[in-house]
């Protein structure tokens, strides 16, 4: 009666396990026993195979993915073999036939070396000289296991103390933004919830025009058209960056500050008058009292000293001299203000930090420092491909680690936080004649990745990586602009996809003086090369898990769609939850209304699938 059983499994060169079924198992009685001499068998029909599902998910932790296989039209006088083909490396399949019929279960096991992604595979059935196949989609899923312990090596002592914000650059070209969009602004800006909104007045928004002693030397109208509405929203506490000196203190050709004792003192007095204007009831000039319209209800606590000196014709020692002159003059007017130092364009930090943190007697900073600020753009060239932009994120993490290391060499600076006060996809802009400012011989082309689905992956990836590195603020550059840079279209007032990305990052990972940042939970992820995972726990016991699909479809993609990824989020270590929501932002998201928040059923393992660049935010409530 041995012919009534299953023949042993045989292993093909590919590593696929193939079950060879004896025909006698598939028909009444034991005739045939898999041999053509055992009898004529059942006349064959067209050989076919059907599957119980068109998609099989095989997690990288070795949990089998299964599909039921049914064979029809087989010649029962010949053996039937079932195998899987076109499997990616690191995946093994095994077919287990069921007794009493031409069917069974195919198991697919992905090892840790199996690359995550979506593949086209097939089940192949061979019966004598006949062959039939049925294709299916094989998904190799990343597994992210969220632990119940705080990872104290990340963030600020294990906490994600990073707030979201945005920026304005008042000038004669954009100062009417709020006037032009009264139906939506500043309500939309307030909805975004930014903290310490950055204000960087340039050109005619610099309020001091001359130094003649006449009242006409000062004009705040262009600057205040932006500043005054900003003072009414969010935390009512913007950061005013004194980005440049008044034009009469600068070189007419380069626009760079001209160093000299008299110019330094004039710049310091200008800065002190700005503090007087917004915080102390104003100042008198040419017989006229200049005072902020919103004083005393709204004042400005945070001030930044100069913008990107390291690419604007200033040496590190000159910047320190400037800083050490301006800050005391401003503090002498209002001792409660806080100061952001450096505001660097990302370059080689070893050229700037060592001298800044040197002992004051050796030329280091000797004035108050509350924050050290830097900027991060991964490119200044629209032709750079998607993978290049993603690859530069770990570099800014190294940069931040270095800055903290240097600040730690001085006792009075070791607890100073880092803020990234400018961040977007591309720093380039039109130099005025249609050419690139960064690459003058190249035509300027708007980079849509600042508002496309690419941004839905890129900004959350940056947020997670920088927050884990201890960065404490991430500023979007800039609020009202074009499709390269804006959260809101400066012409129409409509929201871009970037608005909703930043909004939900702020909502899901709040960090305010009254609501300290969440704990960063320990995490084990089977693959990090194409997905970013962040798990946090709030003081109320709720847990937020962010899943970012940053998989590039092709190495040449520039604003591509990305590649699908499935992530199995394992929260079994966290116990049970009473409810859960899911929010996804990707290329299908409506940029006007934003993503929908969906109620989902809590489970120990939650599957998240993104069809390309994007982010899913899970919130689990106790």
Regions found by a protein language model. Give the residues of each.
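Aromatic/acidic polysaccharide-binding cleft in carbohydrate-active enzymes
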Residues: 420-531
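Mature N-terminal, pre-catalytic/accessory segment of carbohydrate-active enzymes
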Residues: 141-183
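C-terminal beta-strand-rich structural cap/linker in extracellular carbohydrate-active enzymes
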Residues: 599-622
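C-terminal motif of bacterial Sec signal peptides marking the signal peptidase cleavage site
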Residues: 26-29
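Carbohydrate-binding surface patches
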Residues: 526-576, 613-619
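Long beta-sheet-rich domains in secretory-pathway and surface-associated proteins
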Residues: 31-143
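Substrate-binding cleft and catalytic face of glycoside hydrolase catalytic domains
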Residues: 189-389
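Glycoside hydrolase catalytic-domain groove-lining segments
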Residues: 379-437
């Amino acid at each position: 009666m041995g012919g009534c059983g299953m023949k042993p499994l045989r292993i093909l060169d590919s590593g696929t396990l193939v079950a060879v079924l004896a025909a006698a198992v598939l028909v009444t009685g034991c005739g045939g026993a898999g041999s053509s001499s055992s009898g004529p068998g059942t006349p064959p029909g067209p050989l076919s195979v059907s599957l119980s599902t068109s998609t099989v998910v095989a997690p990288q932790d070795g949990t089998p993915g299964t599909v039921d296989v049914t064979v029809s039209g087989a010649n029962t006088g010949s053996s039937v073999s079932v195998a899987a083909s076109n499997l990616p490396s690191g995946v093994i399949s095994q077919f287990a036939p069921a007794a009493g019929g031409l069917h069974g279960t195919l198991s697919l096991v992905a090892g840790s070396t199996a690359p995550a992604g979506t593949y086209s595979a097939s089940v192949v059935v061979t019966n004598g000289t006949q062959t039939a196949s049925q294709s299916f989609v094989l998904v190799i899923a990343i597994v992210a296991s969220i632990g119940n312990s705080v990872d104290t090596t990340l963030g600020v002592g294990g906490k994600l103390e990073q707030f979201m914000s945005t920026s304005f650059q008042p000038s004669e070209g954009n100062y009417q933004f709020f006037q032009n969009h009264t139906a939506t602004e500043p309500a939309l800006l307030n909805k975004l919830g930014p903290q310490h909104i950055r204000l960087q007045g340039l050109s005619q928004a610099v309020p001091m025009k001359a130094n003649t002693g006449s009242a006409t030397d000062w004009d705040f109208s262009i600057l205040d058209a932006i500043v005054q509405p900003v003072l009414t929203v969010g935390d009512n506490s913007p950061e005013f960056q004194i980005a440049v000196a008044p034009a009469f203190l600068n070189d007419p050709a380069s626009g760079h500050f001209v160093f000299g004792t008299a110019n330094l003192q004039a710049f310091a007095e200008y800065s002190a008058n700005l503090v007087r204007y917004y915080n102390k009831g104003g100042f008198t000039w040419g017989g006229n009292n200049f005072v902020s319209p919103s004083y005393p209800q709204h004042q400005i606590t945070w001030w930044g000293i100069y913008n990107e000196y390291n690419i604007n014709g200033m040496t590190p020692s000159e910047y320190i001299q400037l800083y050490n002159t301006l800050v005391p003059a401003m503090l002498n007017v209002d001792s409660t203000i806080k100061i952001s130092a450096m505001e660097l364009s990302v370059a080689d930090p070893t050229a700037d930090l060592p001298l800044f943190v040197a002992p004051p007697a050796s030329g280091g900073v000797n004035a108050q420092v509350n924050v050290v600020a830097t900027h991060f753009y991964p490119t200044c060239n629209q032709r750079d491909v998607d993978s290049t932009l993603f690859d530069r994120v770990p570099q800014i993490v190294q940069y931040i680690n270095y800055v903290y290391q240097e600040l730690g060499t001085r006792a009075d600076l070791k607890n100073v936080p880092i803020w990234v006060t400018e961040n977007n996809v591309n720093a380039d802009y039109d130099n005025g004649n249609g050419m690139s400012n960064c690459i003058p011989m190249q035509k300027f082309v708007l980079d849509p990745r600042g508002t496309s689905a690419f941004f839905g992956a890129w900004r959350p990836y940056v947020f997670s990586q920088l927050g884990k590195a201890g960065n404490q603020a991430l500023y979007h550059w800039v609020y009202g602009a074009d499709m390269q840079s804006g959260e809101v279209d400066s012409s129409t007032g409509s929201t871009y996809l970037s608005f909703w990305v930043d909004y939900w990052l702020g909502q899901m990972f709040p960090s305010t003086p009254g609501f300290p940042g969440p704990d960063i939970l320990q995490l084990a992820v089977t693959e990090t090369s194409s997905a970013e995972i962040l798990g946090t726990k709030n003081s109320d016991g709720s847990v937020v898990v962010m899943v970012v699909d940053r998989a590039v479809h092709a190495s040449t993609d520039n604003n591509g769609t990305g590649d699908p990824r499935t992530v199995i989020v394992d929260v079994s270590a966290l116990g049970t939850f009473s409810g859960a929501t899911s929010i996804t932002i990707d290329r299908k998201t409506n940029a006007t209304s934003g993503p929908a928040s969906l109620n989902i059923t809590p489970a120990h393992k939650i599957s998240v699938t993104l069809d390309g660049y994007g982010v899913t935010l899970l919130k689990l409530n106790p």
